[in-house]
């Protein structure tokens, strides 16, 4: 097991690695590294931030500020909030609903989890994979910078409280990484949260590993708290990680026991969910845990499905 770092030492490292500002909340926001690259000194002030999404059901048309190609079928979209003093208003773990109206007047709505810091001012980022035949992703990938997309929310998934578990395991595949990364990033960068985090992340090839740089930066920055294990079906080049799929034997050897103060969070495409935990019955009904995790003795008391 990874050695447990103390709350005081983590807080000290956090303080040494950031620039002092007037309010502790903005000190926390300033420490985010890569995910806050679009912020500048004028974005982090003593002025209270305005929340964009308050759960009032209102749709907000937001401009695409930047589009970056992440892989052959995935892009990172940066959206501008109403002003540089606005934050999303999201908490961990929560998502937004995105909408577009078809030429025939019907609404196409999809949920997306931002990968940028919840405290980032003036912007938020989504990492989105294009799916053949996907109505929303096809529309989105046809847009350009300065085009707009409508959003509303937040949609609360799991309400995270610091130190609610001694450790958690995040199991994901493909774009299922986004809510898992949101949790990992939030926990690791919070100086008062000592929760151990182990990410198990499966993909077809090393090139398909989304947010790889950000994941490895967190693991490097917090080696006593964050561990990342990749699983790749078709390893290439200098890839260092597990080969093939996440196996039952690996889980048996590496997961905390069902009775421990820990929790497992799972997110991925339907076949991945079917294999390990079973899919949700509905957005509000987690259903029973099935698949490999059930075979290992885990129940809905130990597992959450995004």
UniProtKB/Swiss-Prot annotation:
| Catalysed reactions listed for this entry | 2 Fe(III)-[cytochrome b5] + NADH = 2 Fe(II)-[cytochrome b5] + NAD(+) + H(+)
CDD domains per the record? Answer: cyt_b5_reduct_like
Q: Which InterPro entries match?
A: CBR-like (IPR001834), Cbr1-like_FAD-bd_dom (IPR008333), FAD-bd_FR_type (IPR017927), Flavoprot_Pyr_Nucl_cyt_Rdtase (IPR001709), FNR_nucleotide-bd (IPR039261), OxRdtase_FAD/NAD-bd (IPR001433), Riboflavin_synthase-like_b-brl (IPR017938)
Which Gene Ontology terms describe the biological processes this protein takes part in? cellular response to oxidative stress; ergosterol biosynthetic process
Question: Which residues of the sequence carry a binding annotation for FAD?
Answer: 164-199
Q: What is its main location?
A: mitochondrion
Q: Where are the transmembrane segments?
A: 12-29
EC number(s) reported in the record: 1.6.2.2
Membrane topology per the entry is:
Single-pass membrane protein
The entry's family comment says: Belongs to the flavoprotein pyridine nucleotide cytochrome reductase family.
> What does this chain do?
May mediate the reduction of outer membrane cytochrome b5.
Name of the protein this chain belongs to? NADH-cytochrome b5 reductase 2
Name the source organism: Eremothecium gossypii (strain ATCC 10895 / CBS 109.51 / FGSC 9923 / NRRL Y-1056) (Yeast)
């Amino acid at each position: 097991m990874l050695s447990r770092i103390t709350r005081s030492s983590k807080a000290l490292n956090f303080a040494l690695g950031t620039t002092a500002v007037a309010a502790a909340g903005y000190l926390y926001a300033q420490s985010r590294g890569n995910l806050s690259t679009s912020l500048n000194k004028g974005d982090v002030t003593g002025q209270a931030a305005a929340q964009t999404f308050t759960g009032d059901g209102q749709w907000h048309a937001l401009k695409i500020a930047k589009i970056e190609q992440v892989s052959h079928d995935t892009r990172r979209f940066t959206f501008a909030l109403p002003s540089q003093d606005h934050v999303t208003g999201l908490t961990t773990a929560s998502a937004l609903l995105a909408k577009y109206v078809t030429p025939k007047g019907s609404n196409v709505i999809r949920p997306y989890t931002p990968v940028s810091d919840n405290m980032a001012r003036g912007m938020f980022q989504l990492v989105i994979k294009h799916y053949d035949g996907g109505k929303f992703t096809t529309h989105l990938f046809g847009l350009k910078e300065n085009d707009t997309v409508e959003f509303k929310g937040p949609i609360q998934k799991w309400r995270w409280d610091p130190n609610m578990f001694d450790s958690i395991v995040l199991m994901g595949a493909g774009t299922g990484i986004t809510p898992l990364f949101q949790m990992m990033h939030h926990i690791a960068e919070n100086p008062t949260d000592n929760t151990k985090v182990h990410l198990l992340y499966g993909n077809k090839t090393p090139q398909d590993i989304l947010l790889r740089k950000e994941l490895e930066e967190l693991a490097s920055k917090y080696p006593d708290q964050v561990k990342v294990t990749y699983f790749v079906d078709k390893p290439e080049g200098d890839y260092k990680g597990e080969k093939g799929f996440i196996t039952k034997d690996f889980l048996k050897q590496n997961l905390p026991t069902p009775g421990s103060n820990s929790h497992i969070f799972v997110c991925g495409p339907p076949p991945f969910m079917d294999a390990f935990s079973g899919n949700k019955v509905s957005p509000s009904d987690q259903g029973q845990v099935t698949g490999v995790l059930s075979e290992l003795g885990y129940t809905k008391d130990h597992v959450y499905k995004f």
